Regions:
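Membrane-proximal helix-turn-helix segments that form the acceptor-binding/catalytic region
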Residues: 43-47, 89-106
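Short His-centered aromatic/hydrophobic patch
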Residues: 56-62, 78
Length: 311
């Protein structure tokens, strides 16, 4: 079997290919945000590709091109913003709806968008995101100093990630925490300004490659992800894999998260108390969930079954 992987999101496609059997032939069609790369260049690469299954990340132009070029069987993999935001756009919405109807199978990466996908496809399925355990694995914590080392690891985005909630909460315990933040996201400048106005000092870290993110996780005592969606992001999964407890808003309304130990941490007060209490005991519970639901080989095995059924 030959798998043609098209585009990617948070290295999910790359990780899936990496852990597939050597007996499976693999091709990964990637693109940049350049005009040629994401239009005519992309269409040409898809046209020339020959495979037994085509797996496309995001239900946007990549998926639309593959469908129009007759690539079958076609697996469309939604990653959140395509269903939360693009679906409601006057132009992109038509493309997303076309893809939802034309793909042989639709997958979603988080439970919070599954109900949206099922408005168009009753057979849409949640596939947990895999974690590359060769890159992200536990290391012992360094001895904790007077302050707890907190890393805000997700991109600064107030509407989607709730970064402002994290800043306001941390400012109320600023004498007990040493806060670092990675310099990226549409609201990074606003986030830095808010922290400054509240007297919260931030250690600003440069954005690094995916392969080096583990160093940031290992340097923290607690990792903060997002508070706006109610679902687990890759930041949380990778940080837990690195041996660090994660503070994130996971909604109790999603049965897929029944075994995750933190639920409904979505207010400043809850964020504060969870950061204070976050320790090795919390991490062990989170890590148990991770190994049960996101173990890479199990996710790949499940995906290959979907491929075989779709062929």
């Amino acid at each position: 079997m030959k798998v043609v992987m098209i585009n990617d999101c948070a290295f999910v496609g790359e990780t899936l290919l990496k852990y597939m059997s050597p007996d499976i032939e693999k091709q990964h069609i990637k693109r940049t945000r350049g005009l040629w790369s994401k239009t005519f260049g992309l269409a040409y690469k898809i046209l020339k590709a020959k495979g037994d299954v085509y797996h496309v990340h995001y239900l946007l132009q990549d998926c639309y091109m593959a469908a129009r070029l007759g690539k079958r069987p076609l697996i469309g993999h939604a990653h959140g913003s395509d269903l939360r935001t693009s679906l409601n756009h006057p132009l992109w919405g038509r493309i997303v709806r076309h893809n939802l109807r034309r793909c042989g199978k639709v997958l979603v990466s988080t439970p919070d968008v599954l109900s949206i996908a099922r408005q168009f496809r009753e057979d849409a399925e949640y596939l947990p995101n895999p974690v590359d355990t060769e890159l992200f694995y536990p290391k012992p914590m360094a001895e904790q100093g007077e302050k707890k080392r907190v890393l805000i690891a997700s991109d600064s985005n107030w509407n989607v990630k709730g970064t402002d909630i994290a800043i306001r909460a941390l400012s109320k315990i600023k004498n007990a925490v040493d806060v670092s933040i990675i310099e990226y996201g549409v609201d990074f400048i606003r986030t830095a300004a808010l922290a400054s106005s509240l007297g919260l000092r931030l250690n600003v870290l440069p954005k690094v490659s995916h392969e080096r993110l583990n160093e940031y996780y290992w340097s923290a005592d607690v990792v903060i992800d997002r508070f706006g969606l109610g679902s687990l992001g890759m930041v949380s999964l990778e940080a837990i894999a690195c041996g660090r407890p994660v503070v994130i808003y996971v909604s109790s309304e999603f049965p897929q998260y029944k075994n995750f130990p933190l639920k409904d941490v979505n207010t400043e007060e809850k964020v504060i108390s969870t950061i204070k209490e976050a320790d090795i005991k919390l991490w062990k519970k989170e890590y148990t969930y991770l190994t049960m639901e996101h173990e890479v080989n199990a996710v790949v095995e499940r995906l290959l079954k979907i491929y075989n059924i779709s062929r």
